[in-house]
Amino acid sequence: MRTRSKKTKTVNNNNDLQKSEEKQKFDQLPLDLEIEMFRRLPLKSVARFLTLSKSCATTIRSPSFITSFPSQPCTLIASAATIRTCHNLPSSFKSKDQRLYFFSSSSSSSTVFSTRLTCPLSPYDNLIEYYYHYASGLISIGCNRKQIVTNPSTGRFITLPSVRRRRVVVKSFFGYDPVSDQYKVSCMTERRHGLRQDPSSEHQVFTLGEKKPWKMIDCTSIPDHRPWSNGVCIDGFVYYVAKTGQGMSQLSLMRYALRADNLNLFTSLPEELRTLKLSGDTLLNYEGNVAWPLQLHLIFNVWVMDQDGEKHEWLKKITFNIEPWKSSSRYLDVRGTTHTGEFILAPSHYPDDEFYVFHYNLGKNSFTKKKLQVRIYNVRIVSTSSIIGLYLSFSLL
């Protein structure tokens, strides 16, 4: 009968002890030094460190590391497209499905294909509304009871358990809390066969990484409301505009605290906005504040709110005119912002093969048009329904 050598066991224990001591030394390094070390590595090497230890992953995912690159704004573009493979076959034999493509731009004007995700989009996609939200490197895609979370850096995705209860999902939101290091998806549901002006009746939340089902949120203390805009996540809070009041005839800003799972009516809209016929429903994160761009003809008015102030006032209105570009572009929407404060504008639809976005610099009062050079081998984009969103994308989650 063989017995393990005590000498070998002692050597193994010494190796384990040495690795543990090295890990402790790394954990004790100042954050700025860790960030500088990772910045000197190639991106592929940085990605490998995500699986090395929780400490490395926390540093790489931190906002300090993400915003430490002194480069021009980097933009992530997510585009839902109907694709058809380009084989020499009759059209009836060519495959056709819905896919989600991610493109990322660098400091240059060109954009390269990044990753591709085949989503379970319905063949009746023009009749179904999908909700897309970004939070700290990940994107959630929601359609009724189906919820998907994807990593655009790797193309990987997970499908969440179906939302409980036989109800219709009115809207879904997505957020990240940096304190608890948790991602959460929240869904607002309503009774089947209800009217579009009825308030949402149940609110549920799912925490990524936890092996727990959807959890019901207690909303008995807040007024009835129905989500109307997209959601924007800032410092662990998800903000969205909702219809409130009698007959859902008013608009208010709601705030969902991710760590506490607490939802409340945060503030009402300015009196001036209540009298306008509002068409824009895209909230933005503008320099850490909630912003709402509204378009009147060729002029954009961007309202910015101070959510940290006592009165939660809408502090200022930014105005810029896109008339100089009306001849060279289609109808433009403000789709996002960069970490340097530039607004990103893009058409709602791309009916041909020309892809582009505009960057508006408020300080210089100037527009920059970026044409996106997109080439996908053996695939031709037949039609692109919309640009889903544009975001700062340095994260390697």
UniProtKB/Swiss-Prot annotation:
Instruction: Give the source's domain of life in one word.
Output: Eukaryota
| NCBIfam families according to UniProt | F_box_assoc_1
Renumbered to this chain, region (Disordered) spans 1-23
Query: What Pfam families does the database record attribute to this sequence?
Result: FBA_3
Instruction: Report the residue ranges that make up the F-box domain in this protein.
Output: 24-71
This chain belongs to the protein called Putative F-box protein At1g26510
The protein's organism comes out as Arabidopsis thaliana (Mouse-ear cress)
